[in-house]
Amino acid sequence: MKISLKNLGYEYPTFENNKNGIYDVSLEIDSHKRIAIVGHTGSGKSTLLKLIKGLLKKQTGEININGKIEDIGYIFQYPEHQIFETTIFKDISYGLKRLKLNEKEVLERVEKILELVGLDKDCLHHSTLNLSGGEKRRVALAGVLIMQPQLLLLDEATVGLDLNGKEQLFKILLDWQKEENKSFLFITHDMNDVSEYAEEVIVMDKGKLLYHTNPSELFEKYSDELESLGLELPECISFFNKLNQKLKNPIKISGDIKEESILKVIEEKIK
């Protein structure tokens, strides 16, 4: 699924003046990508996702989607709020009602998606009320992924998760993307997520698009600008930049900027 935004604009009513809208945003989102969206609170990140999904109606500009709006899945900031007080099976399979599948087909889909999100199929008839916060997020994610979206939008879905919980969530997303050849956009305030999981990154400020590039170029060219926006660089990138300031021949990194890759480059340089 490809999405094209041209001069997109949206402004909130005056009584919601604590929210920043979107102003003249143009960008292309290609298929089969992992894209991070970053920016300080109120920069327009969530508004952008809601406009793409159709939860907000654009006021100016164009949104062109190569597909159906129903093929876009959406995970809110606190995914556990997306589930019902019912059994896990009923919650996950709720959206399948409109597809008119038979019981066997529904069960097959539910069991497959449970395996993907790491939940035991023996828990199908357990109540969602008795689940932990992490389990509720998995159920919410399963309920969206079972509809087989072409594109998944995640509005700070990792908020409140510890490092282990975050890694588990991204593993699910990466496995889903690889198996289904799909795309996902995720909002994050943690720049480590950008270096570890994103193929592209969108930087927003005050409702405007500042950069749309790959993580390697972003950290190489715009580190100072990111810090001026209050975005804390990943520790490995910060260390790398400080090291480069002391070297006569600065090290350049292109492509993979995951922490282990950067440390390997530094280690080879020091030898």
UniProtKB/Swiss-Prot annotation:
<dbReference type="InterPro" id="IPR027417">
    <property type="entry name" value="P-loop_NTPase"/>
</dbReference>
<dbReference type="GO" id="GO:0005524">
    <property type="term" value="F:ATP binding"/>
</dbReference>
<comment type="subunit">
    <text>Forms a stable energy-coupling factor (ECF) transporter complex composed of 2 membrane-embedded substrate-binding proteins (S component), 2 ATP-binding proteins (A component) and 2 transmembrane proteins (T component).</text>
</comment>
<dbReference type="InterPro" id="IPR017871">
    <property type="entry name" value="ABC_transporter-like_CS"/>
</dbReference>
<comment type="similarity">
    <text>Belongs to the ABC transporter superfamily. Energy-coupling factor EcfA family.</text>
</comment>
<keyword id="KW-0997">Cell inner membrane</keyword>
<keyword id="KW-1003">Cell membrane</keyword>
<dbReference type="GO" id="GO:0042626">
    <property type="term" value="F:ATPase-coupled transmembrane transporter activity"/>
</dbReference>
<keyword id="KW-0067">ATP-binding</keyword>
<comment type="function">
    <text>ATP-binding (A) component of a common energy-coupling factor (ECF) ABC-transporter complex. Unlike classic ABC transporters this ECF transporter provides the energy necessary to transport a number of different substrates.</text>
</comment>
<dbReference type="InterPro" id="IPR003593">
    <property type="entry name" value="AAA+_ATPase"/>
</dbReference>
<feature type="domain" description="ABC transporter">
    <location>
        <begin position="3"/>
        <end position="231"/>
    </location>
</feature>
<dbReference type="GO" id="GO:0043190">
    <property type="term" value="C:ATP-binding cassette (ABC) transporter complex"/>
</dbReference>
<dbReference type="Pfam" id="PF00005">
    <property type="entry name" value="ABC_tran"/>
</dbReference>
<keyword id="KW-0472">Membrane</keyword>
<dbReference type="InterPro" id="IPR050095">
    <property type="entry name" value="ECF_ABC_transporter_ATP-bd"/>
</dbReference>
<keyword id="KW-0813">Transport</keyword>
<protein>
    <recommendedName>
        <fullName>Energy-coupling factor transporter ATP-binding protein EcfA2</fullName>
        <ecNumber>7.-.-.-</ecNumber>
    </recommendedName>
</protein>
<dbReference type="InterPro" id="IPR015856">
    <property type="entry name" value="ABC_transpr_CbiO/EcfA_su"/>
</dbReference>
<keyword id="KW-0547">Nucleotide-binding</keyword>
<feature type="binding site">
    <location>
        <begin position="39"/>
        <end position="46"/>
    </location>
    <ligand>
        <name>ATP</name>
    </ligand>
</feature>
<dbReference type="InterPro" id="IPR003439">
    <property type="entry name" value="ABC_transporter-like_ATP-bd"/>
</dbReference>
<dbReference type="GO" id="GO:0016887">
    <property type="term" value="F:ATP hydrolysis activity"/>
</dbReference>
<keyword id="KW-1278">Translocase</keyword>
